[in-house]
Amino acid sequence: VADDVHRASGPATSALGTDSPVTNSLTCPPPRPRGLDPETVATVCAWYRTNGRDLPWRRPGTSPWAVLVSEVMSQQTPVARVIGPWTEWMQRWPTPDDLAEEEPGTAVAAWGRLGYPRRALRLHACAVAIATQHDGQVPSDRDELVSLPGIGDYTAAAVVSFAFGGRAVVLDTNVRRLIARAECGIGNCPSSLTRAERELASGLVPDDAPARWAVASMELGALVCTARSPHCTECPIAGSCRWLAAGRPDNAPTRRAQPWKGTDRQCRGVIMDVVRNCPDGVPVETTLSAWPHRDQAEHCLDWLVADGLLHRTDDTVRL
């Protein structure tokens, strides 16, 4: 190797083997963007201080119960649609004890058109568990949280972080997409959370501001690093983003589009809409005739009854 180095100082030869000088100088590739290093993480946190939305459950003094309700409502539902129902719920049931005293059907009726009404049943069951097993206080421990009805890993982490300021790996789709792009150079995250993603995300959480990073990374993903039309020119960490530096390649994992029209999910939603505003119940025939396909309507009504969302007598359906 040393001889090669010494020979390089002599007359250069071209690739054709002649003694003519080589005119093309060697250039090093540009340095790889640093991704989500500690300085970039701090930049995201600083951006949030002046750009974060004033959502009601983020305000000082918000109870852990209010944070928990906001997280359950926000699952697969845009934040803008959650603010109104969340405000109404907190006025009506400001504590778990308040909701636990109600019938489950009352919670389902108040859920309105947020979608996925099973969440209302689970939230009611969660309130009962908190009232009876935790003296009406939302637990701050992650393991105790995931033992509650309807509380999974994400919601538990969000409550630990947003309600109690604890260190937790909060990974919603917005955070996962931000990490995939800025750190991994990939256009989007996989459809399902992987162990590698969780391990990578855990290493990014700063010790001095874990809760701030959780909410800031989520907000940047929701407002700037969006799924379909990311606003890279407005991004505070554009200079560190590996996906942007690579030219925003179309290299995201393939995602299967979820249909809506004509599905059982749409049918169940129509049936729930018919029954929700009639506390005394609706005739079974009226309920079934709200959907054009009788067999599908009967199947979906049976599913809603089996799941506890509706109650059916011989000729009436009610919450």
Positions of predicted regions on the chain:
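Short amphipathic alpha-helical interaction segments
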Residues: 291-305
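Catalytic cores of DNA base-excision repair glycosylases
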Residues: 47-268, 276-295
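Charge-rich, intrinsically disordered N-terminal extensions
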Residues: 26-62
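Intrinsically disordered, low-complexity terminal tails and inter-domain linkers enriched
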Residues: 2-34
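A short, conserved structural fragment
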Residues: 305-317
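Peripheral (non-transmembrane) domains and long loops of multi-pass membrane proteins
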Residues: 289-290, 316-318
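Residues in the recognition helix of alpha-helical DNA-binding motifs
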Residues: 159, 300-303, 318
